[in-house]
Amino acid sequence: FEGSEDADRSAQLCIKAAGEAMKDAGLDDFAGDPKASVIIGSCVGGAVSISDYYEHGKKASDVTKMPISSIAPQVAGQCHAGGVVTNIANACAAGTISIAYACELIRAGKADVVLAGGSDTFAAVPYAGFLSLHALDADGCSPFNRCTGITLGEGSGVVVVESYEHAKARNAKMYCEVLGAGVSSDAHHITAPRPDGEGQMEAINRAIKNSGLKKSDIGYVNAHGTGTAKNDDAEFLSLHTIFDGENDNLSVSSTKAMTGHCLGAAGAIEAVFSIKALTTNTVVPTLGFKDEDMDKLAEKAGKIDFCPNKAHEKELTSVMNNSFAFGGNNASIIFSKEAGNVTVKEEKKPLVITGIGVVTPSGNSVDTYVANAVKNEALTEANLRSSVGKEDYDALGLKMSFYRKLDNFSQLQAVSGMEALKDADYAVTGDN
C-alpha cells in the first residue's frame, strides 16, 4: 500500500499490517467490492497526532488524524473495500472484538471477506495515563510471575477473515476456522477487573458454547496476561475455574512478555500468535521466569502448563485467544484446524426500540427536548453545550461515588443511557 505518509502512526502501522495480510492471503485490490469490509480496533487512536497538535503548533491537519474512527477508513481507502468499514473502541479487547465482529458480518451474509484487527502506537498520551495509574513495571512486565505492572508496546495485527465458500472458490490457503467467540462486560470498575473473574468466565464460556467444542478440546490459550496483580489473579482464577477437572492437558502463555501491551492492537497481534501456534503445533512461552520463580508458579499453575521461558511442540487442534480490557471489556475467540462453513445465516428476528434517552443543549429528557424544540428557539453560543448535574443523577439513582470518577463525556453517556433504560421500563440490577 502506498500514500500513508500523512497518516497518524497508528494508521500507518495498520496499513502496513493490512497490506501484509492481503499479500499473504493472495488478495490484491478489492476494487470497490461491496462485500469487502474493514474492521479495526484501537484503544487510543491517533495518539501521536494528539501529542503533535499540542506540542508543535496546533496544526489543523493533525485533528483529522486523532480519532479512532480515522484508522479503518484509511485502510479501506488503500485497498478500496466498498463494504462495511468501522472501528471498534473497546479498549484493549478491541482487536479481538474486531475479529469476532468480522465473523458475525460474514455469517449474516453482509460480507464475504473482512480485514480485521487492531492498531495502537506508543505515545505520550497513553504513557502518561498508565504512569499516572502507577501501572507500569520499571523492569519489564512479567505475566503470571512478578505481576508488578505492564510494559507498553506498539504495533498492529490484521487477519483476513473470509467465508469458506469465497476462500474455496479462489483456491486460497486456509490457516484455520474461527469456530466461536464470546464477549461480555464486568460492569464493575473503569480499570480493575472483577476479582471473582465472573465477566472473564462469561466470555470464555460463550466462546466455547458458540464453538460447539468441549473444554477438553482447547489445547492452548493465549492469555491476556498483562503482568498486573489484579488482572493476573483474576485470570488465574478464571482459567482454573473453567478448565480444572475438564482439561488436564491445557497450555497457557502470555506473549505480552515479548511484545509489551499493544493496547487495542493486542488482541489482534495475539490472534496471529494463536493461529501460528495452531498451524505449527508450537506453544509459545511466557518469558521472564527465573529459577527461584518456578516453585511459586507451580503452586499457582496446578495442572495447567504456563510455558515458562521455552516454546515447545504440542499437537494442537483448537486454541483460544483471550482479551480482558479496562472497563470490564472481555472477549474470547477460538481458532481451529477443523474445516467448516462460516457463512451460516442467523435466523432473522424482529427488532424493536423500547427506550430513548437524550442529553442535549435543549434538555436532558425527551419531553424537555421536544418542548424546547416546539418553541423553535435558536441556540446561542452561550447555550450550545450539553450538561448534566446533581438533579439528573439523583433522578436516576446514580451515586456520587460513581459519577464523580467520570469525565464529562462519560457523564453525558451515563445519564442518556440510564434515561433510555428508564424509558424502556428496564430495571438495572446486580444480576443483569
Question: What do these predicted ranges mean?
Answer:
Residues 165-170:
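Short helix-loop capping/hinge motifs at secondary-structure junctions, enriched
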